[in-house]
Amino acid sequence: MKPTKSLFVTAALILGAMGVQAAGFVQKGNYLTVQLKQHQNYGPSQIRLQVVSDRIIRVQATAEQSFRSKQSLIIVPQNSKAKYKVEEQGDDLIITTAAMRAVLNEATGQITFYDLKDQVLLKEVAQGGKTFKPFTVPDREIGVDIAKVPEAQKHGWSWRALFDSPDNEAFYGLGQHQSEELNMKGKNEDLFQYNTKVSVPFVISNKNYGILWDSYSYSRWGNPDDYLQLNRAFKLYDKDGKEGQLTGTYVDKNGQKIVRGEDSIYFEYAMPETSEICNQTDKGGIQNLPKGFALNGSKVVYEGYVEAPTNSFYQFILYYAGYMKIYIDGKLVVPERWRTAWNPNSYKFETAIPKGKKTPIRIEWQPDGDVSYCGLRVAAPRSEAEKNQLSIWSEMSPDMDYYFIAGKNMDEVISGYRTLTGKAPVYPKWVLGFWQSRERYQSSKDIEENMKKFRDLKIPVDNIVQDWNYWKLDSWGSHEFEAVS
């Protein structure tokens, strides 16, 4: 029988900030810190658990010798007095609350969450459940203020948390992505803030738990790696079957044609002409389109064949402005989509491509503007088992930091989320009504006349939106209204 060491704890019984040293962990208030017995390459050296409440346990992990001091921008102050029980059984540190158990292996760092019926809620993979890689912010991403940024703030850690997930599990959340996806099981999503994209680092499971990770960095759900350029994932052939690249055909509005080889479709961004750092370090983006070619009114076709290294359902990401259609193996896999060039969009799709076969591909693009964007990349193939795991990756943080929230149902999980992030005020009823919005109104008179017309037609309106151009003509983005209009 394994030796068992137990310690019953109530926050009220902890004397000030005094720490309690046990065999494999240090206890201080509702924090328990473990120095791992086995330090693996790219793994954590320390793990810290915080009992936030009966249903919430915080998990921190660091690859450094100690945890950095930091203040959260997500979590409101927590003043829990939760009761919990701590036991050691062999290498396992077991924390039991009135609603759940967390088991941390002090040798490997693997953590598993159970309900009180001993049913697994969430379990890290046996190897590689927490991985770290050092990360330094590239100079070009800091920009003109690079001299003002302290050296220490340029360095952090990319981390990945990886968990097993049963086939019948579903995941919901991550924010608002216009991705036409609801259940994120087996899906990929990039988390960052954008005009039409609102990212929230929280996911809820139909198994009645949620994970909120405390990171403000670019993050990825699902596949932790960059999407690949087409020539990194497939053998490419032009429309005549010659290996090495696709055929790109550019026809301007006057019928003038340019034909050239394309080893990748990656015209996704523009470089600021005045940025010395960018122009020294980045030669990509739309500057690689044919020199002097006028996009407005043109038609562009990329075509040829791709040969896959393995049988798989390949997960693609399309970045586009203007009109776009994609055919693979003669099938329309992306029906026509359109997006204005000042606000491009991403669209994810997947399709089966067999190993070793030259599979036809055709990308049709009408740029619809003097400046426009087009990109098609693909994720490296992964097994279905890998796709079905719960995977979270964060590009740059001082440490790994997430909250496990358990509940009897999803409502209790959301209640835990609100406990951590604070109570959102209930909106007044008029906010839930009909919002009338157009690109812009240029004067108060404009707004009042339109509002009167709605009333005359007896069309109910609760809100009318003044979007942009409320400022003076030469004061773009100002928070001061133009007084005359």
How would you describe each model-predicted region?
Residues 1-24:
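Bacterial Sec-dependent N-terminal signal peptides
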Residues 25, 29, 48-93, 133:
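A low-complexity, Ser/Thr/Gly/Pro-enriched, surface-exposed linker/loop concept
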Residues 38-40, 51, 63, 306-308, ...:
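Non-cytosolic beta-sheet module surface loops
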Residues 51, 204, 293-296, 301-314, ...:
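Extracellular and analogous surface-interaction loops
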Residues 69-85, 328-349:
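Solvent-exposed beta-strand/loop surfaces of large extracellular or lumenal domains
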Residues 88-241, 255, 314-318, 323, ...:
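Catalytic and substrate-binding clefts that recognize carbohydrates or anionic sugar/phosphate headgroups
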Residues 231-310, 399-426:
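Extended carbohydrate-recognition surfaces in non-catalytic/accessory domains of CAZymes
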Residues 333-338, 342-344, 423-485:
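Aromatic-lined carbohydrate-binding/catalytic grooves of carbohydrate-active enzymes
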